[in-house]
Design a protein with these regions (language model features):
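Short alpha-helical donor nucleotide-sugar binding micro-motif in glycosyltransferases
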Residues: 262-263, 271-275
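Nucleotide-activated donor-binding/catalytic signature segment of Leloir-type glycosyltransferases, i.e.
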Residues: 248-266
Length: 380
């Protein structure tokens, strides 16, 4: 079969949806299928190429609205060659982008069976006239896609619940996932020793944060919490991997706060493997954070807010330490408790790892998608 993934943003742009698409496309190829990815144009990258994995990529002209966070497809994109590829099944990533609307309408017109896979649990914009306009647009986009008749799926149960906001009953889940064996290999290949590189004592606890550096993700509050811990006699270091508007301010804080910028994926895995805990104090409308899955795969103790996917991966306090507040003082108290009892922290991490391996692997997710595609192809 020829699978086509429509994803408005794709690698090398970092992000969970981008890696989700890449991982499923690779599983398509491994199973003997063909994988196409249709995404937005990026400066310096060709309109069409086949990458090192064998994934065929189409980049359609788009305007980089909101500093590239919301690419808007330009009218009448050159796609005749795409539709000539004999696409058997399409996966349309996310419900909100203009490319998603275009892809759904084109797939219906071309008679290509498809599903829509959503990754969020909230509106893209909040507050004021812009927030109201954004909500109106999202409902309009969903209504257009719904009219095409394709089933909607969510990457977590929370996403499926959020889809009801748009009058959509999800057909099922295609959860975010990881490959534990692949991550273990990345952790051991030419590892970067973060403690040695930054002249930390071998026993110094490392707290890791991986994500976009925007206020909703909580990195700045976490940095303040770590500063408070050190002032109160708990020596520890915070390593922040990611980019965004808060990056420069975080860099200026200096030790024990280390803003590393964007890291290659192997180094993110190595950081999680070496960390004493991974902290995600997010208040963002997450879908199912990939970093939580990767931390669980690395057996890194997790400290997190209740966010999308946590109820499935980390059902209760025996799997992770949950935050009831993201205030720096509350973060500091939660981290202090985790660092003070590493045995309990690692017992939780082992439970999270076991649950991950049972339910959240790419092999399992692709098997579900492949079965769905085969059934849809027969009906068409």
């Amino acid at each position: 079969m020829t699978f086509c993934f429509f994803t408005t943003q794709y690698l090398p742009t970092p992000g969970g949806v981008e890696r989700y698409t890449w991982n499923l496309a690779r599983r398509c190829l491994a199973a003997g299928h063909r994988a196409l990815v249709v995404t937005s144009s990026l400066p310096g990258l060709p309109a069409r190429e086949t990458d090192a994995d064998g994934i065929e990529i189409w980049r359609l002209p788009a305007w980089p609205v909101m500093n590239g966070r919301f690419p808007v497809l330009k009218p009448h994109p050159p796609a005749a060659d795409l539709w000539a590829q004999g696409i058997d099944f399409a996966v349309i990533q996310t419900r909100m982008y203009t490319q998603s609307v275009w892809a759904a309408r084109q797939c219906k017109r071309q008679g290509i069976p498809a599903l829509v896979l959503d990754h969020s649990t909230g509106y893209m914009m909040h507050g004021g006239a812009a927030g109201l306009a954004g909500k109106m647009y999202e409902h309009l986009a969903c209504n257009i896609i719904k009219a095409c008749g394709f089933p909607f799926y969510g990457v977590s149960g929370d996403v499926c619940s959020w889809l009801r906001t748009f009058g959509i009953t999800a057909a099922g889940r295609l959860p975010n996932a990881v490959d534990p064996a692949e991550l273990a290999q990345l952790a051991s290949d030419h590892p970067r020793d973060f403690r040695a590189e930054f002249d930390l004592a071998p026993a110094t606890p490392i707290i890791a944060f991986v994500g976009r550096l925007i206020p909703e993700k909580g990195a700045a509050k976490l940095a303040e919490a770590v500063r408070q811990l050190n002032q109160n006699g708990t020596s520890c270091a915070l390593f922040i991997a990611g980019t965004g508007p808060e990056e420069n301010a975080l860099r200026q804080l200096g030790a024990p706060i280390y803003a590393l910028g964007a890291l290659p994926h192997p180094q993110i895995v190595q950081l999680l493997t070496q960390a004493s805990c991974y902290c995600l104090p997010t208040e963002y409308a997450e879908g199912f954070p990939t970093t939580l899955l990767e931390a669980a795969a690395c057996r890194c103790p997790i400290v997190t807010t209740h966010t999308a996917g946590t109820g499935e991966l980390l059902p209760d306090g025996t799997y992770a330490a949950y935050l009831e507040s993201t205030a720096p003082a509350a973060l500091a108290a939660a981290l202090q408790a985790v660092l003070a009892d590493p045995d309990v922290a690692h017992t939780r991490a082992d439970a999270a790892y076991t649950n991950l391996c049972a339910h959240f692997t790419w092999q399992a997710v692709f098997a579900t998608m492949e079965k769905t595609a085969a059934q849809a192809a027969k009906r068409s």
